[in-house]
Amino acid sequence: RRDIRIGDIMRMSSGIMINAPSDPDYDTSTYADHFYLYTGGVNQYEYAASRPAEYPPNTIGRYRNTDPVLTNYLIRLAVEGRGEDYHSFPQRNLFDKLGIRNALIETDTYGNFLGQGLAFMSARDWARLGNLYLTDGVWNGERLLPEGYVEYASTTAPAWVTDGRPVYGGAFFWVDNDVGDDGIPPSFRMSGAGGQSTTIIPSHELVIVRIGKYTGASEVGAALRQMIP
């Protein structure tokens, strides 16, 4: 585990062992650790940090909540290590600058942000966040994301390529860097439960936000095709 880098964690390539529904060998008779982080009443940061290694880092891509949880843990350690308030950090350093006033990020019972899910904003606010990535991390002349960060987020993660599933990038973005049969040009997106998504399409200077019911999740791809000229 000491060989795991922050970059591996942010590409869902840490190799940390939990069972998750997207695993090829997932046992459907078990309750996934992936969901236990939401429902178990545990300190999710300590739980994720205590999991053993299953694969060498940066060799296998797996969609597992422990990786974004560990990233959030590192952020909390860094923010509080500087003597700053952790719970106002996202609002002060990002949302206020983008004009987002009503973002809600839920926490576990220990006050740790559940950044891997349960983040709520209006469609316009998700579009603001998407536009930050469309403009290479610069907003109103101020660089909010490090130079090269957007390229990192939108580039397919090496471990996922090796694993034969080139669908995940950096910074917890899903990527589609080929024009496939769906006709959607290269894009990357923030994706949530039930088909909630914010898709960034650089070639069209376009951000598309979808917020809706779970029952409409299967129609998202068709809707995107209709929106793109």
Regions found by a protein language model. Give the residues of each.
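Residues that flank catalytic or metal-binding motifs in active/ligand-binding sites
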Residues: R2-R5, D67, G115, S122-D125, ...
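Active-site-adjacent helix/loop patches that line small-molecule binding or acyl-intermediate pockets
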Residues: R1-I100, A123-A127, N131-G137
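Extracellular/periplasmic catalytic domains that process cell-envelope and extracellular macromolecules
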Residues: R1-I4, T39-G41, E54, F120, ...
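Carbohydrate-binding/catalytic loop surfaces
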Residues: T30-D33, D108-M121, G169, W174-D176
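Short, gly/Ser/Thr-rich active-site loops of penicillin-recognizing serine hydrolases
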Residues: S218-P229
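Solvent-exposed loop and edge beta-strand segments that line ligand/cofactor-binding
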Residues: Y55-R64, L114-F120, M190-S197, T215
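Active-site Gly/Thr loop motif
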Residues: I100-T107, E151-I208
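Flexible, glycine-rich surface segments
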Residues: P90-R92, D96-V150, S154-P158
